[in-house]
Amino acid sequence: MSTCKICKTELTWENKTLCIRCGVEICEDCSTRNKFKCDKCADKLKIKIPDVIRRSSIEDYKSCPYYFKLHVIDGNEPRQNVLARLGSDLHDLYEHIQRGDVEIKDIDTQTDWILSHIEEDYPEEDMNRVEQRARISNQSFIKLLPTLTNKAIAFEERINFSIGEGIPQVTIAYDRLEEDENGDLHIVDWKTGKVMSGKKLTTDLQPALYLQAVKEKYGKMPKSFKLVYVSDIDKQGNYKERTFHSIDGNKFVCKVGNKEYIQDISEQIKVVQKLFAQIKQGKFSIPAKPDYFKCKMCDFKEKGLCSGNDTQNWININEERQKYGW
């Protein structure tokens, strides 16, 4: 007499089947529950979810769950595009200037050093385009500094915080946290990309997660969150910005012209909780309507890890069928 390796139920010709990976005998009920595998083999295939997930990776999951899987779950590192690399290096430079480690008069010399190293790492890129963005960003940062009159209490601080039990923590890192004369907090974060506009001002997760992170760390919700786009300038050469002001401590409004865009912190947290639940369930399909430009430029496609939206979905489905004997 044989018994199921999982539940110890007596096996008969009516209920006996085999684990599709190792071949041990299990009952049909356990087989169905474990996707045709014994407990030992099922554990080996369980998705290892990180304890902490970056805010930017959450946005990646919203955009393309399969990209998130390849990067965060499988551990494949995408190559930074040249402008993202520039943005990262300039952020480091601006932090050192704020801290007093680098004098503002040396910003061009430091930028020349940054550009020389980028050119070494990206010999195929048009460095005139990269240098132009760097110089515009520096000019904007020089204009920005005198306007930052509140007391700075933290630079480039990373905060991990929980949004619920049984799901990963979120981690964020802002550029500058200020305190005004009334003791109220204000977040300032600069960007080297294009200014945020339209519906994205309501749906983007960065404002809500940054505000909630500071509340968790400092015990009170900031009064504002400002995004400064140092490389995106208007016809007068002034940098563009978007500022979210507190309405009631949980909702923030960003006014652009005659339009108002609301960020509801509680609702945005619920969005992230739902996304984390989907991640735990192993939902990593490519979206039906992906960002085709992002898909075309994806480094994972260049590395042969993804065949693009139309082809990769079929590959993934067929791999699942082979795994589970569908």
Range-by-range predicted roles:
Residues 3, 9, 192:
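Ser/Thr-centric signal marking residues that sit
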Residues 11-22, 30:
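Canonical RING-type zinc finger of E3 ubiquitin-protein ligases
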Residues 24-42:
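Cys/His-coordinated zinc-finger cores
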Residues 43-326:
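RecB-family 4Fe-4S metal-dependent nuclease core
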Residues 1, 15, 23, 34, ...:
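Short metal-coordination and nucleic-acid-contact micro-motifs, chiefly zinc-binding Cys/His arrays
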Residues 2-3, 22-26, 275-284:
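Short Cys/His-rich Zn2+-coordinating modules
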Residues 12, 27, 35, 46, ...:
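Short functional micro-motifs and their immediate structural scaffolds
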Residues 4-7, 19-22, 38-41, 295:
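Short cysteine-rich clusters marking metal-coordination/redox-active sites
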